């Protein structure tokens, strides 16, 4: 699986130009059909997702090109999931209140929060390393708010640093989280 931008036309252009590389061997990825279509629950309703599949011209391994709008093996868009994580970090309300705010079942939101809580130290450290790689003089997030707060703060600090470095008007917290984690922000391990 390879994480790519959400713009389908841009992904097709990059595939045709040979700009995507295989994570296994570094070879060039070429188009190879599509993965199965599925519907994600977005903030404003259902979102149809039919990710592109690619095949390495070097080693022959196939990869699904997952857009930064989705997390691996999740039925909701990254925007919904990351907004729930951010709500927990900033307001410190319970999972039922967050579930009501994002209009998702309470057990689903509790699962997201638990999975993220299991990984907060790994998430914080990975995003902090990326922050130092992107920004020569990074503004480090405040520490001491607890693991959950620190991990979400590291994601936010990296998103801000990417915006400054590449002169982007806004960099989504969700897209940053998906891009850096390779879609595996809530994956086991």
Describe every region a protein language model picked out.
Residues 21-24, 37, 54, 69, ...:
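Generic serine detector
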Residues 30-34, 69-70, 106, 111, ...:
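General helical secondary-structure elements
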Residues 33-35, 96, 165, 184-185:
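Compositionally biased, intrinsically disordered low-complexity regions
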Residues 5, 12, 19, 48, ...:
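Glutamate identity and glutamate-enriched acidic tracts
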Residues 15, 20, 29, 40, ...:
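Generic detector of leucine side chains in alpha-helical contexts
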Residues 1-6, 122-189:
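Long C-terminal interaction/binding lobes of large macromolecular proteins
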Residues 55-144:
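Short, positively charged, Gly/Tyr-enriched micro-motifs
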Residues 5-58, 62-65:
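N-terminal juxtadomain amphipathic helix
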């Amino acid at each position: 699986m390879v994480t790519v931008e959400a713009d389908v036309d841009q992904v097709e252009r990059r595939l045709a130009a040979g700009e995507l590389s295989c994570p296994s061997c570094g070879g060039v990825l070429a188009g190879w059909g599509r993965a199965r279509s599925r519907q994600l629950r977005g903030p404003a309703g259902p979102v149809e997702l039919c990710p592109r599949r690619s095949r390495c011209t070097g080693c022959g391994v196939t990869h699904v090109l997952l857009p930064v709008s989705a997390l691996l093996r999740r039925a909701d868009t990254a925007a919904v999931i990351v907004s729930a994580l951010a709500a927990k970090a900033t307001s410190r309300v319970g999972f039922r209140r967050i579930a009501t705010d994002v209009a998702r079942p309470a057990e689903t939101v509790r699962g997201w929060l638990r999975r993220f809580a299991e990984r907060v130290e790994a998430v914080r450290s990975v995003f902090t390393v990326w922050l130092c790689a992107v920004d020569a003089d990074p503004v480090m997030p405040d520490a001491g708010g607890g693991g959950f707060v620190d991990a979400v703060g590291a994601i936010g600090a990296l998103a801000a640093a990417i915006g400054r470095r590449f002169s982007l008007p806004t960099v989504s917290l969700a897209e940053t989280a998906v891009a850096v984690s390779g879609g595996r922000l809530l994956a086991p391990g």
